[in-house]
C-alpha cells in the first residue's frame, strides 16, 4: 500500500526552491499541489503557460512510488522528461520511436522501481508488455495524470480510441496491488467547456474530484477574424499580415498536410524562409523543424494541429489560422501559444465569405467534417450488430480490423462498458449518438460570425460568466 507523504508545507516549498529555484507557488499552484499530495481526484483547467507541469511533477517527486503521466504527443513527453533529467530527477518515457535498447533500459528501471515519473501515451500504457510490468504487485503506483485531457474529448471518438479505455485503468491496477493501495487521478487541460469537463470526469470515473478552473482570458492576445473573398485573396491577406511584421516569430495553422506543403511552397516562392510541419514527417524531420523554430533559424512554421503542444516559446508575436479549426477548444489551445511573455500578440483567423459562392473551401470542409462524423456512427452501429456482446479488444480487432474506433463510439453512445482496459460488454445494440463534436463545430462557426466581443464569447463558451457590459477592448469587434 502507499506510504503517506509526511513532509510539512515548508518542506514542499523547500523542494520547489531546490528543484526549480522558485521561492513560492503561483496561484493556484499551491492548492493543486496540496490536492495531489492528499491523493484526491482532480480536474484542472489551467491556461497554457500557467505552470501546470510543476503541479503534478512536484507531488510525484515527493513520493516514494511511481506516478504515470499519460500524454498525447512524443514531443510533449520528450520536452518535459528532458527538463526533469537536467534537474537530475528520476523520470523516463516510453513511446514507439525509442530504440530497442532505450525501451529496455526504461522497462528495467521501471521493474527496479527506480522511477518517480513515467511518461507514456494511452496506447503504450495499454500495450501488453508495459501493462504486465505495471500490474506487478510490488510496483507502487501513486497516481495517474492525464496531461492535455481535452484530447480525450477531441480524439477519443476518432483516431485515438485508447483514450476511451482509460477509465478502466485504475480499477484494474488496484486489483493487482496490495489491499489499501490508493491511486488518484488528475486530469489537466488548458481548455474544457462544461460539456467536455463532464465527459472527462465520466470517462475517467473521477471520484468526487476537486475542480480548479482558471479563467483563460489573456489581455495581451488580440483576436481578429477577416473574410477572404477568394482563395487568392486569402493568400494575399496572409502575405500582407506577415509583411507588416518583419522579424517577428509566428505560427500559421492549416487543416491538412497538403495545405501545409502547398502554402509553404507558395511562401517560399514569395521569399520567406519557412517549413511545413505535419504528422506525416519522420520523427527526425519534426525535431529538426522544432529546433530550427525554437532556435530562431526560421521565424514561422506552416503547421497542422500536430505542432505546438508542449513546445514552449515565449516570444511568439502572432498566430494565423489560415483555415479555422473545427473546434473552439483547438482554437483556444493554438492562440494560447502566442504572447506567453506577456507582451502583445496578434491572432488572426481567415474565413471564406458566408455564402461560399466565391470561395467554397470552408463550407466544403465543414460539410466533410459533419459527413465523416455521421459515417463513423453508421459504421459503428453496423459493427455493433456483428460484434460479440462480450469480447477482448485485441481478439476483436484481428477479426474486425477497424473496430477500435467503433468500440470507442459505442462507449461514447452509452452502448458499451469497459469491464477492464481490454474487455468490453455491449449492453445495448442501439444508442443515441452524442452530438459533442458537431455541437462544438457549430459553436466555432458562431464564434467566427459573432458581432459581440470575441473574448466575451470565448469566456461564456467555456463556462465563465461575464457582466453584460464587459468588453475586452482589444479584439476586432471591440475596435482594436
For the regions a language model picked out, list residue spans one by one.
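Conserved pre-motif I regulatory segment
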Residues: 2-45
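Walker A/P-loop
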Residues: 38-58, 70-71
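Post-DEXD/H (motif II) to motif III coupling segment of the RecA-like Helicase ATP-binding lobe
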Residues: 135-143, 150-213
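C-terminal helicase lobe
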Residues: 249-253, 257-259, 265-282, 286, ...
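Pre-Walker A (Motif I) flank of P-loop NTPase domains
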Residues: 38-44, 65-66, 114-116, 183-184, ...
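Conserved interdomain hinge at the start of the Helicase C-terminal
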Residues: 222-266
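Conserved helix/coil segment N-terminal to the catalytic DExD/H
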Residues: 99-143, 153-157
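Conserved nucleic-acid-binding Ia/Ib motif block in the N-terminal RecA-like helicase ATPase lobe
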Residues: 68-69, 74-120, 273-276
Amino acid at each position: 500500500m502507499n506510504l503517506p507523504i509526511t513532509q510539512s508545507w515548508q518542506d514542499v516549498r523547500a523542494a520547489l526552491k531546490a528543484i526549480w529555484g522558485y521561492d513560492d507557488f503561483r496561484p493556484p499552484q499551491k492548492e493543486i499541489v496540496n490536492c495531489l499530495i492528499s491523493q484526491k481526484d482532480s480536474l484542472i483547467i489551467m491556461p497554457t503557460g500557467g505552470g501546470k507541469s510543476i503541479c503534478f511533477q512536484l507531488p510525484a517527486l515527493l513520493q516514494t512510488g511511481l506516478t504515470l503521466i499519460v500524454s498525447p504527443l512524443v514531443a510533449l513527453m520528450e520536452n518535459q522528461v528532458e527538463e526533469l533529467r537536467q534537474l537530475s530527477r528520476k523520470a523516463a518515457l516510453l513511446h514507439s520511436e525509442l530504440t530497442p535498447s532505450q525501451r529496455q533500459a526504461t522497462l528495467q528501471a521501471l521493474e527496479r522501481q527506480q522511477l518517480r515519473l513515467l511518461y507514456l501515451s494511452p496506447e503504450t500504457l495499454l500495450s501488453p508488455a508495459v501493462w504486465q510490468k505495471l500490474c506487478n504487485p510490488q510496483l507502487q503506483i501513486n497516481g495517474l495524470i492525464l496531461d492535455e485531457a481535452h484530447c480525450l474529448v477531441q480524439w477519443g471518438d476518432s483516431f485515438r480510441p485508447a483514450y476511451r479505455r482509460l477509465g478502466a485503468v485504475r480499477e484494474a491496477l488496484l486489483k493487482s496491488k496490495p489491499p489499501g493501495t490508493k491511486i488518484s487521478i488528475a486530469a489537466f487541460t488548458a481548455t474544457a467547456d462544461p460539456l467536455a469537463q463532464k465527459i472527462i470526469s465520466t470517462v475517467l470515473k473521477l471520484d468526487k474530484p476537486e475542480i480548479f478552473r482558471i479563467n483563460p482570458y489573456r489581455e495581451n492576445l488580440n483576436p481578429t477574424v477577416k473574410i477572404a473573398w477568394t482563395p487568392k485573396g486569402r493568400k494575399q491577406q496572409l502575405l500582407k499580415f506577415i509583411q507588416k511584421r518583419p522579424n517577428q516569430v509566428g505560427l500559421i495553422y492549416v487543416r491538412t498536410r497538403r495545405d501545409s506543403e502547398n502554402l509553404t511552397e507558395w511562401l517560399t516562392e514569395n521569399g520567406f524562409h519557412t517549413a511545413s510541419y505535419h504528422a506525416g514527417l519522420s520523427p527526425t524531420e519534426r525535431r529538426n523543424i522544432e529546433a530550427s523554430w525554437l532556435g530562431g533559424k526560421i521565424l514561422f512554421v506552416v503547421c497542422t494541429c500536430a505542432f505546438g503542444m508542449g513546445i514552449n516559446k515565449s516570444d511568439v508575436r502572432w498566430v494565423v489560422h489560415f483555415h479555422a479549426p473545427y473546434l473552439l477548444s483547438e482554437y483556444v489551445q493554438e492562440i494560447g501559444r502566442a504572447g506567453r511573455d506577456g507582451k502583445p500578440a496578434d491572432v488572426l483567423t481567415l474565413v471564406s465569405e458566408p455564402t461560399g459562392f466565391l470561395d467554397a473551401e470552408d463550407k466544403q470542409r465543414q460539410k466533410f467534417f459533419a459527413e465523416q462524423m455521421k459515417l463513423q456512427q453508421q459504421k459503428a452501429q453496423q459493427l455493433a450488430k456483428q460484434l460479440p456482446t462480450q469480447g477482448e479488444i485485441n481478439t476483436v480487432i484481428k477479426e474486425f480490423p477497424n473496430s477500435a474506433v467503433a468500440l470507442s463510439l459505442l462507449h461514447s453512445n452509452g452502448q458499451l462498458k469497459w469491464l477492464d482496459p481490454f474487455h468490453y460488454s455491449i449492453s445495448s445494440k442501439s444508442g443515441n449518438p452524442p452530438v459533442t463534436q458537431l455541437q462544438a463545430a457549430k459553436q466555432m462557426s458562431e464564434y467566427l460570425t459573432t458581432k459581440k466581443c470575441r473574448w466575451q464569447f470565448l469566456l461564456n463558451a467555456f463556462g465563465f460568466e461575464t457582466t453584460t457590459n464587459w468588453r475586452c477592448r482589444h479584439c476586432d469587434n471591440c475596435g482594436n
